Curated annotation (Swiss-Prot):
Its main location: cytoplasm. It comes from the Bacteria. One of the essential components for the initiation of protein synthesis. Stabilizes the binding of IF-2 and IF-3 on the 30S subunit to which N-formylmethionyl-tRNA(fMet) subsequently binds. Helps modulate mRNA selection, yielding the 30S pre-initiation complex (PIC). Upon addition of the 50S ribosomal subunit IF-1, IF-2 and IF-3 are released leaving the mature 70S translation initiation complex. Component of the 30S ribosomal translation pre-initiation complex which assembles on the 30S ribosome in the order IF-2 and IF-3, IF-1 and N-formylmethionyl-tRNA(fMet); mRNA recruitment can occur at any time during PIC assembly. InterPro entries: NA-bd_OB-fold, RNA-binding_domain_S1_IF1, TIF_IF1. The keyword Plastid does not apply. HAMAP family: IF_1. GO terms for molecular function: ribosome binding; rRNA binding; translation initiation factor activity. This is Translation initiation factor IF-1 1. It is found in: Cytoplasm. It comes from Polynucleobacter asymbioticus (strain DSM 18221 / CIP 109841 / QLW-P1DMWA-1) (Polynucleobacter necessarius subsp. asymbioticus). Residues 1-72 form the S1-like domain. The keyword Cytoplasm applies. The gene is infA1.
Length: 72
């Protein structure tokens, strides 16, 4: 899968879950499971409920996504 296949969207973290997983709500109301990308783990970027984030979703599984950016 190339990087052109991913879908980027903006959302808000609703809930922290174990193992660095988060419940994220998109602007259109869709709620799904998100995990932190590797670079965010490497740089110890913390995510809390209420944070605005950018997520990447694959067209194959729209119930999970990778959190790639946390807005300030």
């Amino acid at each position: 899968m190339s990087k052109d296949d991913v879908i980027q969207m903006a959302g808000e973290v609703v809930e922290n879950l174990p193992n660095a997983m988060f419940r994220v709500k998109l602007e259109n109301g869709h709620v799904f499971l998100g995990h932190i990308s590797g670079k965010m783990r490497m740089h110890y970027i913390r995510i809390l409920p209420g944070d605005k984030v950018t997520v990447e979703m694959t067209p194959y599984d729209l119930t999970r996504a990778r959190i790639i950016f946390r807005a300030k």
